[in-house]
């Protein structure tokens, strides 16, 4: 038996950062190397995401349990993978996808497949004595991502009256990731004081950002501009802004409801264009509903030459959806969430498709996270140039930032911060 053969697979139900169950898998190889992976879960999910298998038993966790997914790993996936070479990642992922047999991993569950997929990769890296970013990315894995830091939460991520889901700061002007992280932390601290002085709540949402009640989306942007200046930075030059509109969340019957009124798609496009002129906004995610291809084209035509337009619900890390977007010129960037597609192999293929077509990739967390730091390594491995992993508090968010600090230290003089070369390829 060769040393990198899979000798054991175990799985268990654990809790994510919202106190909801999720799947953890452990893969052990013949050489003794072990890979451990935990799967995140989203709050605002795209309709076209791979299927997250939940138990539906109202007597446990309100039906959110994942014992079925755990059982599928133990009883179906494990027998098919024992003895397989962990270094043959694509073969292992294809085995699980074939075993599932459905179009969206509804049989075994994307959460079951992804947990084993990631644990296998980590075990393979451990067996070779390599950090995960080097194992996945090879010798060119040296680009540290610009963080898009979600410091004001709204929409489905917070219990407040703010329509847009995320208001982010982007410290692209820093000279290193370590400096970018410090800048973000200092703005976050300044924002806390600004909110406090205005008598606004400083409680945080799912992703660690503040979640105050505000009269408009524009009011949130004004707060960020004030905080950036208060922290001693130049808005637009050193630190810019980014939005996750999550427009599907407030779309109904062809209308978008925000700022207290219903608006047409054309009105929303004009609104986003105006905001991007009035504020130093470098990125807008999910500016329109996930299946409104026609208006996505219009938005891209109108401001895509100067603003990064990111498809999250639009593309759901799916190469088929991304290919359609490329052909129809909808958006110019894709958000990458491992659990939207459900395997490491398919995630890497989607990133490759984006890169070949000059679409930027932003590696992303989910609102329900764990202490797993895979996405930090993935961002460096793929040279994506950007990462979304929340605010500057809550340890499930900070864990990813701290992992990137360690990677930057490991790389030493080889490390390049993506902000110095324009936030990655595209």
Swiss-Prot record:
It is found in: Cytoplasm; Secreted; Cell surface. GO terms for biological process: glycolytic process. GO terms for molecular function: magnesium ion binding; phosphopyruvate hydratase activity. It is an enzyme of class 4 (lyase). It comes from the Bacteria. (2R)-2-phosphoglycerate binds at residues 165, 337, 366-367, 388. The active site is at 207 (proton donor), 337 (proton acceptor). SUPFAM superfamilies: Enolase C-terminal domain-like, Enolase N-terminal domain-like. Its EC number is 4.2.1.11. Its cofactor is Mg(2+). Pathway: Carbohydrate degradation; glycolysis; pyruvate from D-glyceraldehyde 3-phosphate: step 4/5. Belongs to the enolase family. This is Enolase. It comes from Cyanothece sp. (strain PCC 7425 / ATCC 29141).
């Amino acid at each position: 038996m060769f040393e990198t053969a899979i000798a054991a697979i175990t799985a268990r139900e654990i809790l994510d950062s919202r106190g909801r169950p999720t799947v953890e898998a452990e893969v052990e190889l013949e050489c003794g190397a072990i890979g451990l992976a935990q799967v995140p879960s989203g709050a605002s999910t795209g309709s076209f995401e791979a299927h997250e298998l939940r138990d539906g038993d109202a007597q446990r966790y309100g039906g959110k349990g994942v014992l079925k997914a755990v059982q599928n790993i133990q009883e179906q996936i494990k027998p098919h993978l024992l003895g397989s070479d962990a270094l043959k990642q694509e073969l292992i992922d294809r085995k699980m996808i074939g075993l599932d047999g459905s179009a969206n991993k509804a049989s075994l569950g994307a959460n079951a497949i992804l947990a084993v997929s990631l644990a296998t990769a980590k075990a393979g890296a451990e067996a070779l004595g390599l950090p995960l970013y080097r194992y996945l990315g090879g010798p060119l894995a040296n680009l540290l991502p610009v963080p898009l830091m979600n410091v004001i939460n709204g929409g489905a991520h917070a219990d407040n009256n703010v329509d847009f889901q995320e208001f982010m700061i982007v410290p692209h002007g820093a000279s290193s990731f370590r400096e970018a992280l410090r800048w973000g932390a200092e703005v976050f601290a300044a924002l806390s004081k600004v909110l406090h002085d205005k008598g606004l709540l400083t409680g945080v949402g799912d992703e660690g950002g503040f979640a105050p009640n505000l009269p408009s989306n524009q009011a949130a942007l004004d707060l960020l501009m004030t905080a950036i200046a208060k922290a001693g930075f130049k808005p637009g030059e050193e630190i810019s802004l980014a939005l996750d509109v999550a427009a599907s969340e407030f779309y109904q019957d062809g209308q978008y409801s925000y700022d207290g009124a219903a608006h047409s798609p054309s009105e929303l496009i004009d609104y986003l264009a105006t905001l991007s002129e009035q504020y130093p906004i470098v990125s807008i995610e999910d500016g329109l509903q996930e299946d409104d291809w026609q208006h996505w084209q219009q938005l891209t035509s109108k401001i895509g030459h100067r603003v990064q337009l990111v498809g999250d619900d639009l593309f759901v890390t799916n190469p088929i959806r991304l290919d359609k977007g490329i052909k129809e010129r909808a958006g110019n960037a894709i958000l990458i969430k491992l659990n939207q597609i459900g395997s490491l192999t398919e995630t890497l293929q989607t990133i490759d498709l984006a890169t070949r077509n000059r679409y930027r990739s932003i590696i992303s967390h989910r609102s329900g996270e764990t202490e797993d730091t895979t996405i930090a390594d993935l961002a460096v491995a793929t040279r994506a140039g950007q990462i979304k992993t929340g605010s500057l508090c809550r340890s499930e968010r900070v864990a990813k930032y701290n992992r990137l600090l360690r990677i930057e230290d490991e790389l030493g003089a080889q490390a390049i911060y993506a902000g110095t070369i324009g936030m990655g390829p595209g």
